[in-house]
Amino acid sequence: VLDTNVVSELRKVRLGKADANVTTWTESVDAADLFVSAITIMELELGVLSIERKDATQGAMLRSWLEQHVLPEFSGRTLPVDTAVAQRCARLHVPDKRDERDALIAATALVHGMAVITRNVADFKLTGVTIINPWEVMQ
């Protein structure tokens, strides 16, 4: 399950401006095996809306990327927050309250038996989910 920062970096891969390790990682995985959480889509939408308010040109470019690339690419591979995910997320909050968005992404991955792909390892470390950081050199 791709975290938001990874989806954003994938945009740079297309432009030839991504981190070299991330580019190498993307070449080593089958795109059909990559999923996003509905929470990741929400975070991307929030980011685009925020940029649109500040910079119309940049906002239009990001809107186009989201609607013409991200949403079609992950059509059928966007995992919802359903009852199982909500319940697993609640268990991640007790006894240690954590960021709800990250907990929902972690819970989504746990329920579906997947890893979280992220640069923000610390945000997911205590959830028990398998974490892959494509910014680090793969062994």
Language model features with spans:
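Residues that scaffold the ATP/ADP-binding catalytic core of kinase and kinase-like folds
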Residues: 9-11, 47, 88-92, 127, ...
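Conserved beta-strand termini and adjacent loop/short-helix elements that scaffold enzyme active sites
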Residues: 37-39, 81-83, 119, 132-134
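A generic structural signal for short hydrophobic patches within well-formed alpha-helices
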Residues: 7, 41-44, 86, 124
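Active-site neighborhoods of divalent-metal-dependent phosphate/nucleic-acid chemistry enzymes
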Residues: 46-51, 59-60, 71-119
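Short, conserved active-site loop motifs that form the nucleotide-linked donor/cofactor pocket
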Residues: 34, 76-78, 129
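Structured helix-beta-strand junction loops
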Residues: 29-32, 73, 112, 127
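Acidic, PIN/NYN-like endoribonuclease modules and their adjacent C-terminal/linker elements
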Residues: 106, 110-139
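Short, well-structured N-terminal submotif of metal-dependent ribonuclease cores
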Residues: 1-36, 40, 50-67, 96, ...
